[in-house]
């Protein structure tokens, strides 16, 4: 994809919802393309945002969080929209939440400097990608979820071979019986918390 231009970015088939056979155009030329939601010119599924509703929702949710002394990190994986990430951050969000290191990289390229990965990061390629992002972007803060000692050992094993890798910031994920992820029992959570605290990774 071309280098970003925040004032008049180039849009093209690499973006969700852009006609795959159409030539790239600048945002300023988008309206001249004559595409309509009703004439099947745009691929589905497609989300359409009303500016007034978006502005209202951003204000409302940020106010809701602030009144409760909460930091908000809205989930970016659904939209994968750098423009929306910036709007959320400008409205006061602490950071943006992603599900994968790939999604995080898109956010970082768009200027996100605080993020959560709401997932367990443990594969060598993902750990290497995260370490590279942290090394290349001074001040970047990212935390990911850990829900087992086994995952922690995988992270430690990778880091033992990567002496220059930064120490990772993690959050202990609590789960519920029958849930998909997270530590299920109090004793297990305490044991994992102690292991995380003692870990060099």
Predicted regions and their residues:
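Active-site-proximal beta-alpha core segment in soluble small-molecule metabolic enzymes
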Residues: 73-200
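A charged N-terminal "starter" segment
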Residues: 1-132
């Amino acid at each position: 994809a071309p280098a970003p231009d925040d004032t008049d970015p180039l849009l093209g088939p690499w973006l969700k919802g852009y006609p795959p056979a159409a030539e790239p155009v600048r945002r300023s030329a988008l309206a001249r393309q004559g595409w309509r939601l009703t004439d099947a010119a745009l691929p589905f599924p497609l989300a359409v945002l009303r500016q007034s509703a978006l502005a209202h929702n951003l204000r409302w949710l940020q106010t809701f969080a602030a009144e409760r002394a909460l930091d908000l990190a809205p989930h970016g994986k659904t939209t994968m929209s750098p423009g929306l990430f910036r709007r959320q951050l400008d409205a006061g969000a602490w950071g943006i939440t992603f599900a994968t290191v790939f999604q995080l990289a898109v956010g970082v390229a768009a200027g996100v400097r605080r993020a959560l990965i709401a997932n367990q990061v443990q594969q060598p390629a993902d750990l290497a990608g995260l370490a590279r992002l942290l090394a290349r972007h001074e001040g970047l803060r990212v935390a990911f979820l850990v829900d087992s000692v086994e995952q922690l050992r995988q992270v430690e094993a990778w880091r033992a071979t990567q002496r220059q890798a930064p120490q990772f910031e993690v959050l202990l994920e609590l789960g519920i019986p029958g849930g998909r992820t997270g530590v299920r029992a109090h004793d297990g959570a305490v044991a994992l918390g102690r292991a995380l605290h003692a870990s060099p990774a």
